[in-house]
Amino acid sequence: MAIASKLLDLYEMTIKETFECLELKQLESVAKILNEAKIVDIYTHAHNLNVAENFQDKMFTIGKKVVCPHDFYNQRLNVLASDHTHVAIILSYSGKASWILPILKKLNEKGVKVIQIGKVGSNYYPQYVNYFIDVSDNEHVRNRLSQFSSHISMQYIMDVLYGSIYNIERIHNSKYIYESIDYMDDRHF
């Protein structure tokens, strides 16, 4: 129970700190941009792919296309195929991954709006990032048991974004799910 209790405390503190980082007007602007995008591309790696694919799944349920290329080669191909109708999300807790800058530069050349999500103080390329969403900086990247804090803060932000996007066209999205659920979910009740 000690581990469960410590994780509960960590999760509560991380979500609270991430909530306190949120800027309402920025969140509304980001949700609007994502809602209007023809395609949302998420660039990330390692454990953050789980968060990206969870967001992708939720967006698919309301008819929004999200692409999560898994490796550096496919990320670069996806960047090359992007245009101004795409919006890119960069998920990187530290903001220091070597793949970020080349992708940001090319997205900028292609006229793609960029939203980066990372720990407080990790926007190292503000000239290429349209919106930066801060998450709790409660994790030490080199001194940790696992990515508990960064994972829960990233998941929380992506869930907040999905909920905000859903709410923009709530009636339409509810209708889409209602009319599509039998095809999406083939379980029989």
Identify the meaning behind each predicted range.
Residues 1-25:
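HTH-adjacent hinge/linker in prokaryotic transcriptional regulators
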Residues 3, 7, 25-28, 73-76, ...:
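N-proximal short alpha-helices
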